[in-house]
Amino acid sequence: MARIGSFLIILYLIYALTLCICDDDESNYGGDKGNLFPGFYRSSCPRAEEIVRSVVAKAVARETRMAASLMRLHFHDCFVQGCDGSLLLDTSGSIVTEKNSNPNSRSARGFEVVDEIKAALENECPNTVSCADALTLAARDSSVLTGGPSWMVPLGRRDSTSASLSGSNNNIPAPNNTFNTIVTRFNNQGLDLTDVVALSGSHTIGFSRCTSFRQRLYNQSGNGSPDRTLEQSYAANLRQRCPRSGGDQNLSELDINSAGRFDNSYFKNLIENMGLLNSDEVLFSSNEQSRELVKKYAEDQEEFFEQFAESMIKMGNISPLTGSSGEIRKNCRKINNS
């Protein structure tokens, strides 16, 4: 544990220095994305990124798993109404929270960290930095703080005044989806197969609940048989943690080799038939193009990091609210004047 803490501190210091010397050329991020650009808060809240980074660093130092949780929040937010912070809203008045959808109920976490980020931002720059931008920055910082790539985050999103429970239930890919369903749900958000594989690489960190992979162990095709593509010793280990009944909330690492470090081990696991979720395994077994991408990223971590950063920027640009649309929430859990 002490080694992990020291590793995270070193990464944080390197990361802070890197951000100071990076070029935030606004011309790279405009166009049809509402003129989002990295320097959006340069004048209005110059310490915004520093504040977010500091809070996330403390949270990840307390619990490394939080990095994966924050990245997952960003993913689940962007796939419903775009990256607008709708997932952060609690039920109130006309709002029916997305937190109770099938993909989020009893699994989405990290909301308290977002609250802490927002409180710090409001103290520094009231009514300035959106919850949507704060979550997008937190996802980037979570990558860096666990050893993954960094990227300049286009900023300027505003927060929604609505949520969509049905959108959350229908738009977000599920762990047991088929390959075609997963690709279709990504395509619906303007993301292609390369994005599917690269973004799935975020499963190099974090954990998943037994209920998300039990069917692979006991009833993959509805005939009472396990998924034969699972490596046998790995499957036996998983059955120890995930019984046929009960233990729904028991956790297993998404990456058995390095669940706390962002690297390309996830793709190596897929080649060895040790992907935890069905949605992981199908990337290697169901399509030649995705299989070749898995092999490429398994062989070349730098290639994976570059594509992951590019795909995260692309995902973060899904249907942003900008200009006078939406609002800047004072509290990420509720709309203003509610």
From Swiss-Prot:
InterPro entries: Haem_peroxidase (IPR002016), Haem_peroxidase_sf (IPR010255), Peroxidase_pln (IPR000823), Peroxidases_AS (IPR019794), Peroxidases_heam-ligand_BS (IPR019793), Secretory_peroxidase (IPR033905). Binds 1 heme b (iron(II)-protoporphyrin IX) group per subunit. Binds 2 calcium ions per subunit. GO terms for biological process: hydrogen peroxide catabolic process; response to oxidative stress. There are 73 peroxidase genes in A.thaliana. The record marks 72 as: Transition state stabilizer. Disulfide bonds join 45-125, 78-83, 131-332, 210-242. Its EC number is 1.11.1.7. The keyword Iron applies. The keyword Iron applies. Belongs to the peroxidase family. Classical plant (class III) peroxidase subfamily. Ca(2+) 1 binds at residues 77, 80, 82, 84, 86. Substrate binds at residue 173. This is Peroxidase 15. It is found in: Secreted. Removal of H(2)O(2), oxidation of toxic reductants, biosynthesis and degradation of lignin, suberization, auxin catabolism, response to environmental stresses such as wounding, pathogen attack and oxidative stress. These functions might be dependent on each isozyme/isoform in each plant tissue. Its cofactor is heme b; Ca(2+). It comes from Arabidopsis thaliana. PANTHER family: PEROXIDASE 14-RELATED (PTHR31388:SF104), PEROXIDASE 72-RELATED (PTHR31388). It catalyses: 2 a phenolic donor + H2O2 = 2 a phenolic radical donor + 2 H2O.
